Amino acid sequence: MLTVIEDLLSKKEVTQFTQALDKGQWLDGKHTAGSQASKVKYNQQLDDGSALAIELRNTVIRKLSGNALFMSSALPNKIYPPKFNRYQGGEHYGLHVDASVMPIPNSHQMLRTDLSATLFLSEPKTYDGGELSIETQFGLQQIKLNAGSVILYPANSLHQVNPVTKGRRTASFFWIESLVRSNDQRSMLFDLDQSIQALTVELGSNDAEVKRLTGVYHNLMRSWATC
């Protein structure tokens, strides 16, 4: 399941992010890639230890935590601290699959990567290329969203960032360990939750069938959650 979360950041917030990132310290992205990924990774990455990176990643996490669509679709248990990258002058990230398990920085915890996420910080009209290409069961999906919007997709997907041939593509990226490991089960829970919300608006929260479906949702969560 691919989920688009529009306008996680407002236009004003995007401008604040990009102005701050223009002044940040950028490093060769290969330094943070695994042995296989480093062979196909050509981009720049914001210094993770900088005060700017810490400030911006905290803002992203705060916005995610307050977004109902993100919470419903991802069912997050842990969120890997968001990172920031940029591509320009033909830079790209070749076809790869993200690591299955990652250590969370500055902790003794590990994170299972159930979902990958990209928060676009550049408007599509400001750069050529740079599509996030994801191989799905329905074929190749080419993703290029408005600045401030997020794409969530299964972390076991083969994907790549196409070469940026003009302008600059800046983004934040991160991973989520979900309470529900299975993509299929998580997708069913999301559909059920969206239906419950729609029926609640139409019939009210005290409707017997709304209550029944809500009970089904929570019982499925109880059966499938891995926390």
Swiss-Prot record:
Q: Which GO terms describe its molecular function?
A: 2-oxoglutarate-dependent dioxygenase activity; iron ion binding; L-ascorbic acid binding
Binding of Fe cation occurs at: 96, 98, 159
UniProt binding sites for 2-oxoglutarate: 169
Q: Which residues form a coiled coil?
A: none
Name of one Pfam family that matches: 2OG-FeII_Oxy_3
Annotated GO biological process: DNA damage response; intracellular iron ion homeostasis
Give the SUPFAM superfamilies listed for this entry.
Clavaminate synthase-like
Q: Which UniProt keywords apply?
A: Dioxygenase, Iron, Metal-binding, Oxidoreductase, Vitamin C
Any idea where the Fe2OG dioxygenase domain is?
A: 78-178
Q: Which PROSITE patterns match?
A: FE2OG_OXY (PS51471)
Cofactor(s) the protein needs: Fe(2+); L-ascorbate
**Could you confirm whether the keyword Lyase appears in this record?**
no
NCBIfam families assigned to the protein according to its UniProt record, in alphabetical order:
PRK05467.1-3, PRK05467.1-4
Q: What is this protein called?
A: PKHD-type hydroxylase Patl_2273
Organism from which the protein derives: Pseudoalteromonas atlantica (strain T6c / ATCC BAA-1087)
